[in-house]
Amino acid sequence: MKKLLLLTALASVISVSASAAEKLIVAATPIPHAEILELIKPTLAKEGVDLQIKVFTDYVQPNVQVAEKRLDANFFQHQPYLDEFNKAKGTDLVAVTGVHIEPLGAYSSKYKKLDELPSGATVVIPNDATNGGRALLLLDKAGVIKL
């Protein structure tokens, strides 16, 4: 299903980008976005598109580089993040299509469950407004914090 959705999304990008060149440079986060792109790379090659994947662990640079036309597209973000980025950076990037929303995970070498966290424990959340807000809502729903 993800492969079909991504092929559809990339078809739109390709119709704009590949008409000028057969090379399509797309930024992606390592997991799962770059992995998904790797899956469709052979299919795109059959269509004459040389998909080049640039992997980023930073959520800012993919948008900056698309805005500066150093990359053709990126694949990693949901619409609220893109909207916040455009507002903060004064860019006008647009989504070709929506993407799936990744689940948030909680990881600890000390605790196996959220209910094991002691009162006053330190919890790290994403540093961007959209994902940070999402993390706070999930922690509230799990009873870890009270909003």
Where are these regions (language model features)?
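A local structural motif
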Residues: 43-55, 119-120, 144-147
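Ligand-binding "clamshell"
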Residues: 84-96, 111
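Alpha-to-beta junction loops
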Residues: 67-77, 121, 144
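Short, well-ordered beta-strand elements
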Residues: 21-31, 51-55, 122-123
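Immediate post-signal peptide segment of exported/extracytoplasmic ligand-binding proteins
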Residues: 18-25, 44-45, 114-120
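Short helix-initiation/N-cap motifs at beta->coil->alpha
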Residues: 53-64
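A conserved helix-loop-strand patch within extracytoplasmic ligand-binding domains
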Residues: 96-146
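Gram-negative bacterial Sec-dependent N-terminal signal peptides
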Residues: 1-20
